[in-house]
Amino acid sequence: MAQSRERLAEEYSVLAQVAEELQREIQLAQTLIAEVDSAILALKNISSLEDGKEILVPVSAGVYVRASIKRQEKFLVAIGSNILVEKSLDEAVEFLNKRKEELSQLVERRMNDLNKVVARIREIESSIR
């Protein structure tokens, strides 16, 4: 009986860590989804600006640089490994929407995993009491 309780306590501890990691992954993916939405909106807004229009571009940590719009019909899109590809507005938005869908599916899978882990944690809690 004592070994069984020890085993359950160990399993509980491992599952609690797994649940925390799943929650972090879900939160990160949701943050990335919000960034993708923001990028899509920015692309659409920029594409409607006239050539030469001055804008502020964020550099980092609340620092901005003034820039002028040139050739807003093409955008450089990061596709991974520091590789940029020139895409039209429609292509860029399509790429970002695909990325958003992949992230949404990841969130769904991780939520399912988290629900299973939480269910097992509850089983352990009820069996220990």
From Swiss-Prot:
Q: What is its main location?
A: cytoplasm
Would I find Endoplasmic reticulum among this entry's keywords? Answer: no
What cellular-component terms does GO give this entry?
Answer: cytoplasm; prefoldin complex
Location(s), subcellular: Cytoplasm
Q: What are the record keywords, sorted?
A: Chaperone, Cytoplasm
The alphabetized list of GO BP terms reads: protein folding
Q: Which family does it belong to?
A: Belongs to the prefoldin alpha subunit family.
Q: How does it assemble?
A: Heterohexamer of two alpha and four beta subunits.
What is the role of this chain?
Answer: Molecular chaperone capable of stabilizing a range of proteins. Seems to fulfill an ATP-independent, HSP70-like function in archaeal de novo protein folding.
List the protein's name.
Prefoldin subunit alpha
- Native source species: Thermofilum pendens (strain DSM 2475 / Hrk 5)
